[in-house]
């Protein structure tokens, strides 16, 4: 089966930094992540207090919301940017169906 991976030591700190950097409440963060239908806003608090580790899907949603690489969030050797690129009303870029 292999060895369990080490848990990132700064994950909770970085998730809180993302939410604060985006200027969002916990409820707004949940909406921004697009996970409001699947989890309660209290889960955001649990992530930020290091009481629970988010799933990969949730971490990907954080990375998209903040417009940063997933590696920046989960790798303790990487720092998040001081200003998050996602602090504008980011809804993604619509892909063209042109060929």
PLM regions: where:
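Residue-level signal for the short linker/turn that defines the boundary of a DNA-recognition helix
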Residues: 10-13, 23-24, 39, 54-57
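Residue-level recognition of specific faces of alpha-helices
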Residues: 14, 43-46, 72
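Recognition helix of helix-turn-helix/homeodomain-like DNA-binding domains
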Residues: 34-53
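A short, Lys/Arg-rich alpha-helix, primarily the initiator
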Residues: 1-22
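Short, charged recognition helix plus adjacent turn
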Residues: 2-5, 64, 74-99
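Key DNA-contact positions within bacterial/archaeal DNA-binding proteins
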Residues: 27, 38, 42, 71
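Short alpha-helical "recognition helix" segments of helix-turn-helix
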Residues: 29-33
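DNA major-groove recognition helix of helix-turn-helix/homeodomain DNA-binding modules
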Residues: 51, 55-72
């Amino acid at each position: 089966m292999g060895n369990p991976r080490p848990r990132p030591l700064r994950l909770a700190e970085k998730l809180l930094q993302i939410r604060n950097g985006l200027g969002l409440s916990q409820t707004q963060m949940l909406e921004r992540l697009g996970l409001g239908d699947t989890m309660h806003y209290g889960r955001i608090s649990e992530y930020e207090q290091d009481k629970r580790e988010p799933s990969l899907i949730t971490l990907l949603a954080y990375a998209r919301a903040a417009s940063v690489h997933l590696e920046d969030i989960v790798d303790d050797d990487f720092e998040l940017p001081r200003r998050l690129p996602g602090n504008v009303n980011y809804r993604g870029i619509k892909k063209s169906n042109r060929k």
